[in-house]
UniProtKB/Swiss-Prot annotation:
This is 3-hydroxy-3-methylglutaryl-coenzyme A reductase 2. Glycans are attached at residues 118, 304, 548. It comes from Arabidopsis thaliana (Mouse-ear cress). Residues 101-146 are annotated as: Linker. The modification Phosphoserine is found at residue 550.
Length: 562
């Protein structure tokens, strides 16, 4: 039997061995083709892209004309045949080439019998190739470095402050090092800003970047709030004296009068991108297309793919020249929903772009939403949860608990909250201090404090009801959620749990966030009732002088500077 070995180069005195069998050239995939490679490649590539373009164009025309896709003519049949043929060629050619290249090295063998006896093989040792080894995962590159050295590296800019969590793998250690670096760079002390007692892993990548500690805000409990027959103890995070006490007095007056009642009018988060067209006529055409009821089902299916909770409710548009502002409104389950609605809007924009290629998307938000800004569109159309809350306060409760009269409250509300706000040109500010209560509950329950701007839009109405008093608050823009954002932090989650609305409601998605909005409105109702009573009775200044003043010196002389 012939001894077969891998062929090695054989030389004698630096010259080629002439009588060694010469290997045939390596086979290529193109050897099987009757035509030159560049011709066949050019032909089939051109055929492939031409047929794809033709078929996609025809498919789009059929969708526009509501023609069934399975109805084809002769040109489409030819295009399909060309597409299949070119696809098989490209796939088969690449496959053959891959097989040939992977097997070419293993196929090059020589027969030692072809070499004359007076010649010897070059049997120099060939070292085997070691397989690539994957290094085991190493510990953090800075684990063995002292904190003092890392602080110096951060100060001189060698290590970016924002990368400490990634490089160290320890969020608390990163916060401590960053804190020390900030103190040395600024020359100011952070004494008083606590570092210990907080889970920094819980905010990584979702709540706060480059932390150096956390701010302590006291949380008070007001209540019980009797709302729709259920009692709630309401957490309020605030540094304003009298706020919790005043709201608590309002809760007492409402409870003694039979409680408050709420109505959820609407639940729809909004997002309004801005898109541009070559002309105003073209922009108007797309506006009519988006607002056409016959197109809503298709657009809603595309929008709702973004989430199992997102449900498109309406699309309203406004136009400014050749710029179009479509305002999408959708329900978002128990999430506040800004990310959810933005993803759905992006899906619709991609689809509309395919229908109207001349559309230019300027921005996913065009401020017609309108987020974190006082705006007429929010005040009129609403954003988030639209809640109305009311209570009937007995005349004797007004006198004994609130220390005023029905007539005084009615007159004050008209002249202050209605006429006074109108004279000031207020937008959504026809109330005494709804933002106080909204902010306090928002911070305690992990909501976005910046959305207090529109969430505090409120119309407070106080009217006589016989001898008694009817008070109501209408709040069209309460933007809250019980999942996502700051709601997952331990302190905020505990406050949500106290209210019975922690997390999502699997049985009835969205009901937890809706209930939280009702509680916010009920708390605002109590706060409005108590403050208006204090003003009517002339107690506001006296109470604030007693409970909302601080004599503690926080000037530079009392601080310890580093």
């Amino acid at each position: 039997m012939e001894d077969l070995r891998r062929r090695f180069p054989t030389k004698k005195n630096g010259e080629e061995i002439s009588n060694v069998a010469v290997d045939p050239p390596l086979r290529k995939a193109s050897d099987a083709l009757p035509l030159p490679l560049y011709l066949t490649n050019t032909f089939f590539l051109s055929l492939f892209f031409a047929t794809v373009y033709f078929l996609l164009s025809r498919w789009r025309e059929k969708i526009r004309n509501s023609t069934p896709l399975h109805v084809v003519d002769l040109s489409e049949i030819c295009a399909l045949i060309g597409f299949v043929a070119s696809f098989i060629y490209l796939l088969g050619f690449c496959g053959i080439d891959l097989i040939f290249r992977s097997s070419s090295d293993d196929d090059v063998w020589v027969n030692d019998g072809m070499i004359p006896c007076n010649q010897s093989l070059d049997c120099r040792e060939v070292l085997p190739i070691k397989p690539n080894s994957v290094d085991p995962p190493r510990e953090s590159e800075l684990d063995s470095v002292e904190d003092e050295e890392i602080v110096k590296l951060v100060i001189d800019g060698t290590i970016p402050s924002y990368s400490l969590e990634t490089k160290l793998g320890d969020c608390k250690r990163a916060a401590a090092i960053r804190r020390e670096a900030v103190q040395r760079i600024t020359g100011k002390s952070l004494t008083g800003l606590p570092l210990e007692g907080f889970d920094y892993n819980s905010i990584l990548g979702q709540c706060c970047e480059m932390p150096v500690g956390y701010v302590q805000i006291p949380v008070g409990i007001a209540g019980p709030l009797l709302l729709d027959g259920v009692e709630y103890s309401v957490p309020m995070a605030t540094t304003e004296g009298c706020l919790v006490a005043s709201t608590n007095r309002g809760f007492k007056a409402i409870h003694l009068s039979g409680g408050a009642f709420s109505v959820l009018v609407k639940d729809a988060m909004t997002r309004a991108p801005v898109v541009r067209f070559p002309s105003a006529r073209r922009a108007a055409l797309v506006m009519f297309y988006l607002q056409d009821p016959s197109n809503f089902e298709r657009l809603s299916l595309i929008f709702n793919k973004s989430s199992r909770f997102a449900r498109l409710q309406s699309i309203t548009c406004t136009i400014a020249g050749r710029n179009l502002y479509p305002r999408f409104a959708c329900s978002t389950g128990d999430a506040m929903g800004m990310n959810m609605v933005s993803k759905g809007v992006q899906n619709v924009l991609d689809f509309v772009k395919s229908e109207f290629p001349d559309m230019d998307v300027i921005g996913i938000s065009g401020n017609y939403c309108s987020d974190k800004k006082a705006s007429a569109v929010n005040w009129i159309e609403g954003r988030g949860k639209h809640v109305v809350c009311e209570a009937f306060i007995k005349a004797e409760i007004v006198e004994k608990v609130l220390k005023t009269s029905v007539e005084a409250l009615v007159e004050l509300n008209t002249l202050k909250n209605l006429v006074g706000s109108a004279m000031a040109g207020s937008l959504g500010g026809f109330n005494a201090h709804s933002s106080n209560i909204v902010s306090a509950v928002f911070i305690a329950t992990g909501q976005d404090p910046a959305q207090n701007v529109e969430s505090s839009h409120c119309m407070t109405m106080i009217l006589p009801d016989g001898d008694d008093l009817h008070i109501s608050v209408s709040m069209p823009c309460i933007e809250v959620g019980t999942v996502g954002g700051g709601t997952q932090l331990a302190s905020q989650a505990a406050c949500l749990n106290l209210l019975g609305v922690k997390g999502s409601n699997n049985e009835k998605p969205g009901s937890n966030a809706q209930q939280l909005a009702r509680i916010v409105a009920g708390s605002v109702l109590a706060g409005e009732l108590s403050l208006m009573s204090a003003i009517a009775a002339g107690q506001l200044v006296k109470s604030h002088m007693k409970y909302n003043r601080s004599s503690r010196d926080i000037g530079p002389s009392s601080q310890v500077n580093r």
